[in-house]
């Protein structure tokens, strides 16, 4: 199975979700000066920022990570977290990334996610990779 790449702000909600998920994952650094590069296809798990619009929905660190053509080329899908208080903007970062990068939006969960979210994502990620061609 290929990897997960995620970003978690200082609130650590996404980090806690990843820990509970128990799947191999690489974190995009919080410090904007630090860079990572991936070498295999991955699913991105990203929190949504802002209060409603598309501007500012995707964290700057994630934008910088995806602006690296090598990293962007290996992206296969996106999962977003958010807050239902933002209504239609709930999980908007996932929508923005899926549209701009031409990958499927796979799942959306609130804040740290529920046990049901953990189970759904674990199962969904496994099934997603099983459906992918070997060299995708």
Curated annotation (Swiss-Prot):
It comes from the Bacteria. InterPro entries: Flavoprotein-like_sf (IPR029039), RNR_Ib_NrdI_bac (IPR020852), RNR_NrdI (IPR004465). It holds the Pfam family Flavodoxin_NdrI. One of its GO terms (biological process) is protein modification process. One of its GO terms (molecular function) is FMN binding. Induction: Induced 2-fold by hydroxyurea. Belongs to the NrdI family. Probably involved in ribonucleotide reductase function. HAMAP family: NrdI. NCBIfam families: nrdI. This is Protein NrdI. It comes from Escherichia coli (strain K12). The gene is nrdI.
